[in-house]
UniProtKB/Swiss-Prot annotation:
Residues 1-52, 86-107 are annotated as: Disordered. The keyword Cell cycle applies. It comes from Xenopus laevis (African clawed frog). The modification Phosphothreonine is found at T28, T99. Residues 1-37 have a biased composition (Basic and acidic residues). One of its GO terms (biological process) is mitotic cell cycle. Protein phosphatase inhibitor that specifically inhibits protein phosphatase 2A (PP2A) during mitosis. When phosphorylated at Ser-67 during mitosis, specifically interacts with ppp2r2d (PR55-delta) and inhibits its activity, leading to inactivation of PP2A, an essential condition to keep cyclin-B1-CDK1 activity high during M phase. Belongs to the endosulfine family. GO terms for cellular component: cytoplasm; nucleoplasm. Interacts (when phosphorylated at Ser-67) with ppp2r2d. This is Alpha-endosulfine.
Length: 125
């Protein structure tokens, strides 16, 4: 089935040969584009870690985006150093839903509100 005719007649190829030629054609434009980019930017991709300046800055230690990041990191360091009493293990929150009977009674106000005046005053307007 892989008969190949030379001359004006067409060439018959097997499925594998067709795939190989298609892959070569697909890779060729990519390689050409890659060569153009390498010619335009010769230093691109040489150092995987970046410039020497960047590597030096990264080796110095942690840097902060702004003063807020610095203060948050500083507060975390202080919290680690201070021994604090952990929360009560017996204290459980969110399990009990209060009812009106569970709530303490409100204390009546000693000063009467001017807004809640006498009913008689409202009728005499």
């Amino acid at each position: 089935m892989s008969d190949k005719y030379i001359g004006d007649s067409h060439l018959e190829e097997t499925g594998e040969e067709k795939q190989d030629s298609q892959e070569k054609e697909a890779v060729t434009p990519e390689k050409a584009e890659e060569q153009k980019l390498k010619a335009k930017y010769p230093n691109l991709g040489q150092k995987p870690g970046g410039s020497d300046f960047l590597m030096k800055r990264l080796q110095k230690g942690q840097k902060y985006f702004d003063s807020g990041d610095y203060n948050m990191a500083k507060a975390k360091i202080k919290n680690k150093q201070l021994p604090c009493a952990g929360p009560d293990k017996n204290l459980v929150t969110g399990d009990h839903i209060p009812t009106p009977q569970d709530l303490p009674q409100r204390k009546s106000s000693l000063v009467t509100s001017k807004l809640a005046g006498h009913v008689e005053d409202l009728h005499h307007v």
